[in-house]
Amino acid sequence: MIVVQSERIRYDTNVINTMRKGEFAMRAQNLTLLTDLYELTMMQGYYENPSDQIVVFDAFYRKNPCGGAYAVCAGLEQVIEYVRDLHFSPDDIDYLRSLHIFNDDFLEYLRGFHFTGDIYAIPEGTVVFPREPLVKVIAPIMQAQLVETAILNIINHQSLIATKTSRIVHAARGDGVMEFGLRRAQGPDAGIYGARAAMIAGCIGTSNVLCGQMFDVPVKGTHAHSWIMSFPDELTAFRTYARLYPTACILLVDTYDTLNSGIPHAIQVFKEMRAEGIPLTFYGIRMDSGDLAYLSKEAKKMLDAEGFTDAVISASNDLDETLITSLKNQGATINSWGVGTNLITSKDCPSFGGVYKLAAIMDKKTGKFIPKIKLSENEEKITNPGNKTTYRIYGKDSHKVIADIICLVGETFNEDEPLLLFDPIATWKKTLLAPGTYTMRELPVQVFKDGECVYHSPKVMDIQKYCKEELNTLWDETKRLVNPHEVHVDLSKPLWDMKHALLDKYHFE
């Protein structure tokens, strides 16, 4: 393990205070040093032992998060921004020099460093499964090595939050789910990009105003208990809020007494609005504490009795997919859900186990890729070698996902011929699909070609629409929250043969 400490001179506070705001913004966008130290020490090793090898790295994950049977891929737009701006600034070079572990020649090389390779990726919002490459980097080895940490950091975080959100939205059974987690997120970036991922996976809005501005997504919110407490009484607080926001009048009713004060006062305000001819276009109550199942049913009775049958009954308070499912099963009349902590932190499953592994090295003489494999005592950690792509297989009549198949680039398939699938771990398991019973779609798209971005990132709300379409291709059994049916990710025969040839080779060596 290398342990180093910078001898860099501390910035003068007055200098920092006089820097232009834009300079900070530009510096924040250059994330080239958002990497683990060993990426840079390996790069210097490649530089000192000249290697311009073209390699293939795959970013993938091994196990579905949150006990589910799928994940929702997210974060590609931020990966693109990172790669586009990949360069070492003079400040970066100065800092690396201060560590006293990098040679001057190598640091000089870094001054002109930029990405020149190819990247293929599965589009955001796509439902994905273990072991299939979410991002594939084909580039000179130093470039491909450097981008590992940032790619995993971005994809792991946003895919985790998107997957967790998808489960919460599924539990809500068509009710609106709002992302309310900014104040509980692990820092500003986690709040902003976590909210972005939540919108991709189906939230109807976020409380995060900066996220709304950055990604053009709906922002939503009501008021806090402090609003009520700042007035002489609850009724005055409600009346004032209703005058300000008559077309979005959701009143928080649990500051003092939900059933004996909050809801009766809310109903009184709604009656006054109705009497004054104010259209009740979007109105209702929110509860943030107590027995939400019981309180919501009582609230529904009280609202219906006064003719407010279309009032929104919204709930918050440490919600997640398990609690929402329980409330639904108890007959709760809640039809709008504000989910914060457990969504933005993915509290019960706080990590997405994405990894980044070398899969092939190009033979300079032939231009063909030489497959590479990582072995392990744990068979699930044995990698799939070669330059690969992934196809999704659907039932021709059902249009539902049957399986995914990982294959070598260049393989062709004919949907009018039988298709033989090989389990990557249980080698005795094979599946034969009859001709004419399935359709196939290649998942990855090219994002960078020779260092230039060739992909247009869709808007977040367009990604959300695509994600909903993706989720509709899954059987209900795959989307259930407990003990779901898993979709198989199989190997083609050529890839299966390649993998087992390498296993045999290294076994006997």
Where are these regions (language model features)?
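An N-terminal, globular interaction/scaffold subdomain
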Residues: 81-85, 121-124, 128
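Short coil/turn segments at secondary-structure boundaries
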Residues: 94-95, 163-167, 181, 479-486
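Short, positively charged and aromatic/hydrophobic N-terminal segments
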Residues: 2, 10-18
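Structural motif
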Residues: 176-179, 218-221, 248-251, 283-284, ...
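Buried, small/hydrophobic-residue-enriched core segments of structured protein domains
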Residues: 15, 19-54, 63-65, 101-102, ...
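Gly/Ser/Thr/Ala-enriched C-terminal appendages of enzymes
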Residues: 20-53, 66-68, 304-306, 311, ...
